[in-house]
Amino acid sequence: MEPPEGAGTGEIVKEAEVPQAALGVPAQGTGDNGHTPVEEEVGGIPVPAPGLLQVTERRQPLSSVSSLEVHFDLLDLTELTDMSDQELAEVFADSDDENLNTESPAGLHPLPRAGYLRSPSWTRTRAEQSHEKQPLGDPERQATVLDTFLTVERPQED
């Protein structure tokens, strides 16, 4: 009698078993309270075994962050920020004043700010509008303004 297909007598199926300790996974029942084994410690930061986490690049933090002060690009965030909130406006103004004081040359004093921030898009919009502005005395502009007012008026009721 022949064996069923796919199960030859000379074939031995063997799976390669990798010890769990090599993968960084503790064996069950070893009394290791579920903590991941630490392979090394670099700069005070524990690095887990390579089977769980592979660190390809290591870099230093860009800057330290305190609980009260976070540095980010203010110009991008001012469009999304409600500047009518007085406390928030003061925080932005304070951080902007600090930047001006550190960047100004000795002997020169920065001009006081009015308490608002400008973003590049606001500046661009104002610059574009100033190119498009026509003097108020221009008859063409006055006709446009009058047409606008005439179309907005309510019809008189009889």
Swiss-Prot record:
Keyword vocabulary terms for this entry: Phosphoprotein
Keyword Phosphoprotein included in the entry's annotation: yes
Biological process, per Gene Ontology: regulation of signal transduction
InterPro entries: Dysbindin
Family annotation (Pfam families): Dysbindin
Residues annotated with Phosphoserine modification: 95, 119
GO cellular component: cytoplasm
Compositionally biased spans, kind Basic and acidic residues: 125-141
Protein family: Belongs to the dysbindin family.
Protein name in the entry: Dysbindin domain-containing protein 1
